[in-house]
Design a protein with these regions (language model features):
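Extended, well-ordered protein cores
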Residues: 7-509
Length: 509
């Protein structure tokens, strides 16, 4: 538990821009180095994105926007003791920053000018009459609501935290308060504390970005429960992967007959996290820590799917059917033997990083839609899929990346017996590292198939049968300035470092 004596001096890490001095350049001028490739943002309703083949975009480090949000959050914390205690517990018990859990804040209308100057824009979304909603289209920032009488200067009148399950949050904090919205509502919320003119709320979303609680119909509730069960019971292992893909696509259509694609997307990824978590100890430990505060994986950043060349186009078609829009695409075939398509479903708030083996001569094609032929050799991603199955099918996600206080999480997990590999991104605006990988048993039939195709040596085959191979990770990530992008060279380095043929677990950073 946090020391109560430290609460008054807690200048929350939320005020990162000033407390740590990370950012000093104006958001309008600050762009990440050209080596960091980015893409166009999504919106709701999603705008037309520039095709990835048209060129790469640099995501900005929006330090002024972060500073502005942080100032408002700090002002709220100074007046709301429950929120202040929770911020300290998040830091000390989960290794996370209060900032990363904020869904939205409600401020005075006169604050609009400052937020607009920092890069926020008006969003057309369902909200109370007379309320302006602002979002940042180029950065990961909480949204801002400006209703009449919405705050006092820099002090928000309301701050809402994003939970994975609202009932879990209330139970974790022993709160006997009503929940607005039954299960199945796009937005559910509860009042957590009301102190000194500030109200702390907790919210739960189901494929929605709006700010009005609308009770679902009984039919929709039944449909949502049925859809969740269809995803949870999806069969993953078939005689051939083609059969598995066909089954997944059929299951998708069955779900879409029950609910809209935004709800279907939200429910699908909740089950994918559940499946991945069951196969990764670091994930279970951290989930338990976050569940103690009733938050679940509300801090997820992106979901990483490794895919075979044969079914990469199928995975991307599946995602687009769920409402994903393609963002940046990485072509690292000549550099490191891999490529990746990043996609975003803005309404559900889900980002997918899907990677695949890529040959040097394939860097000029749109490999997200063009079917890739069998390759004469396996890269890191292809071998992982050969040993364990595709993430879309048997293996589940390679990793979930969530947003943390990087150093605190590393140290706190170490105390739980979980080591962290050396960072593969170590910038002021982006730090990333894997927990040491979970070693999985490899089926003999998979090894035999790879041997028969000449893709493994006898020595490698023997090693995988005897020792297994690294399967999945939890990724520790810390972002600043709302930076949304990734570092291609850093990803190349970690892909090479986790190749099952020559993996040597890095020393803890």
């Amino acid at each position: 538990m946090a020391d109560p004596k430290s609460e008054k001096s807690l200048v929350l890490r939320v005020a990162r821009a000033t407390a740590k001095g990370f950012f000093h350049l104006p958001a309008s001028a600050t762009l990440v180095h050209a080596a960091l490739l980015g893409g166009m943002p999504s919106a709701v309703p999603p705008p037309a994105l520039a095709p990835a083949s048209a060129g790469a975009f640099d995501w900005p480090v929006c330090s002024e926007a972060e500073r502005l949000v942080s100032v408002h959050l700090e002002a709220f914390l100074l007046r709301n003791a429950f929120a202040r205690r929770l911020a300290a517990r998040l830091r000390d018990e989960t290794g996370t920053d209060f900032f990363e859990w904020v869904d939205h804040l409600v401020v005075a209308p006169e604050e609009a000018k400052a937020f607009l100057a920092a890069g926020f824009e008006r969003e057309k979304v369902e909200a109370p009459r007379g309320t302006t909603v602002l979002w940042h289209p180029r950065a990961m920032m909480p949204r801002v609501l400006l209703p009449p009488g919405g705050g006092h200067g820099e002090v928000p009148s309301v701050l809402a935290l994003r939970t994975e399950g609202l009932g879990d949050f209330l139970a974790a904090h022993d709160l006997d308060v009503p929940i607005e919205g039954e299960f199945g509502a796009r937005l559910r919320r509860a009042l957590v504390s009301d102190e000194n003119g500030t109200r702390l709320q907790a919210v739960e979303r189901l494929g929605g970005r709006g700010f009005l609680v609308r009770e679902p119909t009984a039919k929709f509730v039944r449909s949502a429960l049925a859809a969740r069960e269809l995803w949870r019971t999806r069969k993953r292992d078939f005689a051939t992967d083609a059969e598995g893909v066909t089954h997944a696509l059929a299951r998708l259509e069955a779900v879409l007959a029950l609910v809209d694609r935004d709800a279907a997307c939200d429910l699908f990824f909740a089950e994918e996290r559940r499946f991945w978590e069951a196969r990764n100890r670091a994930a279970r430990v951290q989930k338990r820590r976050q569940d103690r505060l009733g938050l679940g994986w509300g801090n997820h950043d992106h979901h990483t799917f490794r895919c075979s060349r044969a079914h990469f186009a199928d995975l991307n078609a599946f995602l687009q059917r769920l409402g994903f829009q393609k963002r940046e695409r990485y072509y690292a075939g000549a550099e490191a033997g891999w490529g990746a398509q990043i996609s975003e479903q803005a309404t559900a708030g889900i980002v997918v990083f899907a990677d695949v083996d890529l040959m040097p001569e394939e860097t000029a094609i749109d490999f997200s839609i063009q079917r890739l032929p069998a390759a004469p050799r396996l890269g890191t991603v292809g071998l992982w899929c050969g040993l364990h199955g595709d993430s879309f099918l048997q293996a589940g996600m390679h990793h979930l990346e969530a947003r943390f206080d990087f150093a605190r999480l590393r140290d706190q997990l170490a105390a739980e017996g979980i080591r962290t590999m050396k960072p593969f991104s170590d910038f002021e605006f982006l730090r990333q590292a894997f927990t040491e990988g979970e070693r999985w048993t490899v089926r003999s039939a998979r090894v035999a198939a790879l041997r028969q195709q000449g893709l493994l040596t006898a020595e490698q085959a023997e090693s995988f049968l005897r020792d297994g191979a690294i399967g999945s990770h939890l990724e520790n990530l810390e972002r600043h300035g709302g930076f949304k992008g990734f570092n291609q060279k850093s990803v190349s380095a970690i892909i090479a470092a986790t190749d099952p043929r020559n993996i040597r677990e890095a020393q803890a950073g």
